[in-house]
């Protein structure tokens, strides 16, 4: 009789563990299939474009954003905030303002956008919070083409334990 009691108790524990595991899996599935709410509409467009050609910001899901390995955001001045980069948890390569190796000579300097000093300081602060939080980042590339994006302090890169390559271009 006591054996039966312990056997039933063990079976109950096993069933409870199985139910908890199933519940956690279902919650994870629901979370990953939720639609992302971006803080910046231009960054939402850039991230959705990175995911695929037929993806628009309204139908981006967390599982799509987590799958991004490489992100090139271009000129940071077109964004109100860079916070949405944090959503790309598996990001390995981040390129900001192109890469110096990607620039083609421009005919006119008017073709280039420039950041104000205050904007550059704001983005530098945001990057110092965002980049170290990207645990898998291996390559960081930044370009200050014709001093259009004067971010000068990259000390935050020292906090990135998986960083293998840092490319900082300055054309001056």
Model-derived features: positions:
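Short amphipathic alpha-helical segments that mediate assembly, nucleic-acid/protein binding
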Residues: 12, 43-44, 127
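Aromatic (phenylalanine/tyrosine) cluster motif
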Residues: 5-6, 23, 114-117
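Membrane-interface motif at the C-terminal end of an N-terminal transmembrane signal
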Residues: 24-35
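LRR flanking "cap" motifs
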Residues: 36-87
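Concave beta-strand-loop units of leucine-rich repeat
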Residues: 66-131, 136-172
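Residue-level recognition of alpha-helix termini/interfacial anchor residues
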Residues: 9, 33, 130-133
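N-terminal Sec-pathway targeting helices
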Residues: 4-20
């Amino acid at each position: 009789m006591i054996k039966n009691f312990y056997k039933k108790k063990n079976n109950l524990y096993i069933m409870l563990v199985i139910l908890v595991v199933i519940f956690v899996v279902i919650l994870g599935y629901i979370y990953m299939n939720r639609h992302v709410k971006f803080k910046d509409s231009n960054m939402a467009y850039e991230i959705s474009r990175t995911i695929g050609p037929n993806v628009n910001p309204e139908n981006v899901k967390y599982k799509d954003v987590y799958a991004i390995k490489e992100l090139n955001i271009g000129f940071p001045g077109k964004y109100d905030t860079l916070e949405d980069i944090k959503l790309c948890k598996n990001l390995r390569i981040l390129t900001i303002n192109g890469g110096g190796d990607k620039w083609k000579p421009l005919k006119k300097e008017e073709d280039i956008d420039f950041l104000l000093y205050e904007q550059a300081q704001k983005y530098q602060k945001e990057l110092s919070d965002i980049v170290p939080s990207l645990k898998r980042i291996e390559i960081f590339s930044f370009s200050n083409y014709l001093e259009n994006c004067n971010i000068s302090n990259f000390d935050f890169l020292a906090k990135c334990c998986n960083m293998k390559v840092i490319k900082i271009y300055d054309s001056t």
